[in-house]
A protein has these predicted regions:
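N-terminal glycine-/serine-/threonine-rich phosphate-binding loop
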Residues: 1-32, 41, 45-54
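Conserved phosphate- and dinucleotide-binding cores of soluble alpha/beta proteins
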Residues: 2-18, 69-223
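Short, ordered loop/turn segments at secondary-structure junctions
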Residues: 38-40, 59-61, 116-117
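Short hydrophobic/aromatic-enriched beta-strand-loop microsegments
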Residues: 51-60, 220
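Glycine-rich phosphate/diphosphate-binding loop of Rossmann-like nucleotide-binding domains
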Residues: 52-54, 66-70
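Short gly/pro/ser/thr-enriched loop/turn and capping motifs at secondary-structure boundaries
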Residues: 60-65, 160-161
Length: 223
């Protein structure tokens, strides 16, 4: 996936739905995609029929549609985050073990995950912060990070304390090594490649302002 020829800018920071719509727009036609728990699930609401994207959910379904509302809600039809969803024509259901075979076997073009930290080299930390009430095991995110051809991350750029989640080196336990290719935040989209971290788009801030927040060299498409 190539970078844009020039830096794109927007005057306002993005909300959660706007960010999800941006991620949906960037998913290539015909892709097989897994949407992780949390913010990434919103992406399903913005995919178009013309994109012909097939959504996979870890609990055993291909052909997942947008989030269910009103009379669409079926308590037995949920995604991995236990959110009621819809099914599209041709949807299929299968055992959890078969679902993980899809994840581990390289059959997913993209997975979209949340994160606590992403490093300058694309390492992903999204399962444990060391907090006493944190979940005790890594879960399926490890399989997705390893098995998907591309890993997109959706996250806020800063923690509640104002620290950057995009870091030179992750300090939390890793979910995957060198797996993240794009990071979508409310302030910017970052591309992670061999040359470093490139700012593709900014929202409500400048590249110089980003450089004051993120503790690493940031490139732009122009250099």
């Amino acid at each position: 996936m190539s970078t844009l020829p020039s830096l794109q800018t927007s005057p306002e920071m993005l909300g959660r739905s706007e960010l999800a719509a941006l991620v949906a727009r960037d998913i290539p036609t015909g892709s097989f995609v897994n949407l992780g728990i949390g913010q990434p699930t919103l992406v399903s609401n913005f995919l178009t029929e013309e994109q012909n994207v097939t959504l996979h959910t870890e609990n055993g379904m291909l052909g997942m549609g947008p989030e269910a509302v009103g009379e669409q809600i079926d308590g037995d039809l949920i995604n991995a985050g236990k959110i009621p969803v819809t099914e599209l024509p041709g949807a299929s259901y299968f055992h959890h073990a078969d679902s993980f075979a899809i994840m581990r076997g390289g059959h997913l073009d993209i997975c979209v995950l949340g994160a606590f930290q992403v490093s300058a080299t694309g390492d992903l930390a999204n399962w444990h912060t060391g907090a006493p009430d944190a979940i005790p095991a890594v879960g399926g995110a490890m399989d997705l990070a390893t098995g998907a051809k591309d890993v997109f991350v959706m996250m806020s750029l800063l923690t509640r304390d104002g620290a950057s989640k995009l870091v030179e080196t992750c300090t939390y336990p890793l979910t995957g090594v060198g797996c993240v290719t794009r990071v979508y935040t409310e302030r910017a989209v970052f591309l992670i490649g061999r040359d470093g971290v490139t700012v593709r788009e900014t929202f409500g801030c400048t590249v110089e302002e980003l450089r004051s927040l993120v503790p690493m060299p940031l490139l732009t498409p122009a250099g």
